[in-house]
Amino acid sequence: MAEEKSYKYVIIGGGVAGGYAAREFSNQGLKPGELAIISKEPVPPFERPELTKVYIDLEVNPTLANIYVCAGTGEAKQYPNWYKEKGIDLIVGTEIVKADLASKTLVSDDGKIYKYQTLLIATGSTNIRLSEIGVQEADVKNIFYLREIEDSDELALAMELYVQRGKAVIIGGGFLGLEISSALRANNHEVTMVFPEPWLVHRFFTAEIASFYESYYANKGIKIIKGTVATGFSTNSDGEVTEVKLEDGRTLEANIVVAGVGARPATSLFKGQLEEEKGGIKTDGFFKTSVPDVYALGDVATFPMKMYGGTRRVEHADNARKSAAQAVKAIKAGEEGKTIPDYDYLPYFYSRFFKLSWEFYGENVGESVLFGDNDPKSPKPKFGTYWVKDGKVVGVFLEGGTQEEHKAIAKVARAQPSVESLDVLSEEGLSFATKFYSTSL
């Protein structure tokens, strides 16, 4: 007979959302043996964004312990013994292969059965593979996708192997492409980025913002090829990649390829059991799903946007952390016959690479207004962009800002103050946000 365990709460997924949900349960009050985290990854929850940043910096040579949650918010790191001390069963290296939400039963890949009273789905996303978008010979050696800790470990080994002679091609011009390119270049690899869009981070950056980063990267020796895609690869006798074939007929030498062509939420386990929307699991403002006692967090959740109306699915660590806290607070409040406010999320994105660091709050819709020093040759560039819709500032981007300035732009994005004109806003620049922030304290 299969081994069976029962818990009051079960979290499926050991990523950012799972780790921060565990922290919130601990903060709210948790009895030993009430909570289990079941994760297919072999390690405790860690800050996944760091896989493309500090974790592959060979000069820093960090360990996994450096990036355990809750390092991303400056709180104490949750080492393996933290879960033991809190009475949380951390079950790693175990994948749930069957979920019957009607009977509140989960079955793992090793045949064990887990029963729960309340389930939190924090399964995150899976990378889209090159073969899924029609790229030929995409299963050769030294093509990397960064999602799990093993991915970054393997890339770091390849970076060490090819140090001083590395030729890396990054397929994709999004956030991951920017971060990985800088890490490889900082570790003395020749780097080429390839993507089909007309500029970097096309869905998010304006052409003016992208122009700065493209020039900055060019000054660092990174080559950028736009408007084409990879179609296949050449290999040596060991099956290792040697060339990337492009649609425009060019070939690029490469002994390392990193693909960042998108991701999809990992929801297949629950198909036909939960209501879905916009590619994710539909939830309310407390991250409750269409099935009682089942919650969805982070990347997999499509939730109501209180500020803007409608619903949205957000793939970002910030939302993973905050949605986890919201769900756990809602669960505990419900047990006590209390209520909490609906989730009121302000979209937030950030990135850092080389000596640059930017943050964005709000929405990138409407007319854009550039301000500040966006000279890529500047020793300390500092610039930003406001987005104005219907006479109100609805989004703000800032490169090179301070902590206080980031608070200011966040305040502006949430309050959405009116502006006299775009010209006046451009002239005021960052001072518009800092003045608004100081007067609202």
Swiss-Prot record:
Positions that bind L-ascorbate: 321, 352
Organism: Arabidopsis thaliana (Mouse-ear cress)
SUPFAM superfamilies for this protein: FAD/NAD(P)-binding domain, FAD/NAD-linked reductases, dimerisation (C-terminal) domain
Keyword Aminoacyl-tRNA synthetase (UniProt): no
Protein name: Monodehydroascorbate reductase 3
Keyword Transmembrane: no
Top EC group: oxidoreductase
Modified residues (Phosphoserine): 418
GO BP terms in the entry: regulation of biological process involved in symbiotic interaction; response to jasmonic acid; response to symbiotic fungus; response to water deprivation
